[in-house]
C-alpha cells in the first residue's frame, strides 16, 4: 500500500500549487517600516494606495508620544480578562466616548471589528443557561442580511440554514427587504447591513431600512466600520442618511479605518451590551485591545470631534481625486464616497494591471473573484491624507494609460459583489 503524504491526503498542496499557478495566491511580500502614504516592500519604495489607515494617525508624532506614555502607565496588555480583573481604564474611557458619539447607552469593545461581528451573531442566535432560572434561547431568530455584507458577518452566520434562519435582500434594496420581512411574519428578525460598503463605496439607504425595521418590529444592526467618524456632519455628503444612524438598535464600529489603529466595538442599549459580555464569547474569552491602543484611539476620536476640518479636507481631496479619474474616462463606482473602485473586468487582466502598477511604484489592492463576481475585477482605492498632488496625478495618469482607452466614460452601475451565500 502506497503511503500518501499528509498534505496530499488533505489537498492543501494541490490547492496551493493550483491557486499560485492561476494567480490567486502569491508569496507574501515583506513590508519594512510603517504603512502610510508611502511604503517599503522587499526593499523597494512604493506610493501606497492599499492602506486603510487613511488619515495616518499611526505616524502622527503626538499620537505616538501619547501611546508611549500610556504604555508606561498601563503596560502593553491587560494581562487578564475584564471578567476576572475588571475593565481597564483606557477601555472604560474609550467605550464611554464611543457611546456618547453614537448616542447609545453602552458600548463593548473587541480586539477587532471582525470579532465584534462574530460575537454579535453568536450572541443573537445563542442558547445559554447560568441556571434553570437564568438563561436565554434565541435559536429561533432569523437574520436578514444585505447580500453584500462583509465576509465576517457571513462567516459568523454560517451555522444557520440559508433560506430558513438566514435570508438576504438585494444590495441596498429596501423594497426587497420589505418583501422578505412580510414573509417572515412575527418571527424574531434581525436586519443586518453596512453603512458604507468597502468594495464599491456604496452607502446604504439607512433611513428607509430602519423605517422597515421599526414597522415590522425587527431589530437592526449596522456595521459602521467604514462610516465611523467620516459622515454625519452637515457639510459632508450623505448627511441625511447618517442622521438616522443612531435609530439602529446596534451599531458596530471599527478602529482600523478613520482611527487607523486596531479594535472594534458594538454600541446599544445597556441590557444588550450587558448580555453580550457573556453571550458574544469574542470579548470575554479572548484578548482585548491593548490598553495604550485604546487610550490612543480615544484621543484620536476626541481630536476628530474637535477638529472637523481634518475629515472635511480629506473628503474634499477624495472627491477631487474621484473627479480626476472620471475625467480620464475610467469606469468607477456610482457613489461619491471616499472609497473609489475602478473597474478592470476580466480576472486574467487584473493581475497584469497589478504587476504593471507595481513596476511603476504603486501598491494597489486588486479585488477579483471570490471577493467580487467572476470577471468583475476592480481596483479599490482609498486616498491617503498625506499623498502629494504630484503622486496623485502620476497615479491617475498611470491608470489612464492602462485602463482609460479600454473603458467607456460611464460609471459602474451594475457592479454586483459576490457573497458567501
Language-model regions: role of each:
Residues 312-319, 326-360, 383-385, 416-421:
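Conserved PLP-binding catalytic core of the aspartate aminotransferase-like
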Residues 241-275:
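Active-site PLP attachment segment
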Residues 81-82, 96-122:
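Short loop-beta-helix segment that forms the pyridoxal 5′-phosphate
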Residues 124-151:
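Conserved PLP-anchoring active-site segment centered on the Schiff-base-forming lysine
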Residues 288-307, 313, 317-319, 326-327, ...:
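Structural motif of enzymes handling amino- and sulfur-group chemistry
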Residues 167-221:
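Active-site phosphate-binding strand-loop segment of PLP-dependent enzymes
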Residues 5-76, 218:
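N-terminal "arm"/small-domain region of PLP-dependent enzymes with the aminotransferase-like
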Residues 57, 61, 65-74, 90, ...:
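PLP-dependent enzyme catalytic core of the Aspartate aminotransferase-like
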Amino acid at each position: 500500500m502506497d503511503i500518501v503524504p499528509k498534505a496530499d491526503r488533505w489537498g492543501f498542496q494541490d490547492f496551493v500549487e493550483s491557486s499560485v499557478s492561476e494567480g490567486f495566491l502569491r508569496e507574501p511580500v515583506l513590508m519594512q517600516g510603517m504603512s502610510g502614504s508611502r511604503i517599503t516592500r522587499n526593499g523597494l519604495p512604493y506610493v501606497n494606495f492599499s492602506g486603510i489607515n487613511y488619515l495616518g494617525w499611526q505616524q502622527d508624532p503626538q499620537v505616538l508620544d501619547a501611546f508611549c506614555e500610556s504604555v508606561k502607565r498601563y503596560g502593553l496588555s491587560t494581562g487578564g480578562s475584564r471578567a476576572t480583573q475588571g475593565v481597564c481604564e483606557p477601555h472604560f474611557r474609550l467605550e464611554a466616548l464611543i457611546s456618547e458619539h453614537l448616542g447609545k447607552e453602552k458600548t463593548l469593545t473587541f480586539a477587532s471589528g471582525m470579532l465584534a461581528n462574530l460575537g454579535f451573531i453568536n450572541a443573537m442566535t445563542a442558547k445559554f443557561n447560568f441556571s434553570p432560572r437564568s438563561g436565554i434561547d434565541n435559536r429561533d431568530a432569523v437574520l436578514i442580511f444585505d447580500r453584500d455584507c462583509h465576509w465576517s458577518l457571513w462567516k459568523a452566520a454560517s451555522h444557520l440554514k440559508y433560506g430558513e434562519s438566514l435570508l438576504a435582500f438585494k444590495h441596498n434594496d429596501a423594497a426587497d427587504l420589505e418583501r422578505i420581512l412580510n414573509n417572515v411574519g412575527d418571527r424574531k428578525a434581525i436586519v443586518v447591513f453596512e453603512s458604507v460598503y468597502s468594495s464599491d463605496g456604496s452607502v446604504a439607504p439607512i433611513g428607509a431600512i430602519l423605517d422597515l425595521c421599526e414597522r415590522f418590529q425587527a431589530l437592526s444592526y449596522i456595521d459602521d466600520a467604514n462610516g465611523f467618524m467620516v459622515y454625519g456632519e452637515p457639510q459632508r455628503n450623505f448627511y441625511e442618511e447618517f442622521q438616522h444612524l443612531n435609530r439602529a438598535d446596534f451599531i458596530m464600529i471599527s478602529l482600523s479605518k478613520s482611527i487607523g489603529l486596531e479594535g472594534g466595538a458594538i454600541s446599544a442599549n445597556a441590557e444588550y451590551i450587558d448580555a453580550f459580555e457573556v453571550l458574544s464569547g469574542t470579548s470575554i474569552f479572548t484578548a482585548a485591545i491593548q490598553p495604550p491602543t485604546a487610550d490612543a484611539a480615544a484621543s484620536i476620536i476626541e481630536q476628530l470631534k474637535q477638529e472637523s476640518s481634518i475629515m472635511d479636507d480629506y473628503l474634499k481631496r477624495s472627491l477631487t481625486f474621484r473627479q480626476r479619474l472620471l475625467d480620464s474616462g475610467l469606469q468607477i463606482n456610482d457613489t461619491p464616497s471616499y472609497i473609489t473602485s475602478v473597474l478592470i473586468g476580466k480576472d486574467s487582466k487584473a493581475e497584469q494591471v497589478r504587476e504593471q502598477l507595481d513596476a511603476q511604484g504603486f501598491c494597489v489592492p486588486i479585488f477579483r473573484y471570490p471577493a467580487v463576481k467572476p470577471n468583475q475585477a476592480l481596483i479599490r482605492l482609498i486616498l491617503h491624507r498625506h499623498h502629494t498632488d504630484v503622486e496623485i496625478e502620476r497615479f491617475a495618469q498611470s491608470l489612464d494609460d492602462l485602463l482609460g482607452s479600454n473603458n467607456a466614460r460611464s460609471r459602474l452601475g451594475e457592479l454586483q459583489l459576490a457573497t458567501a451565500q
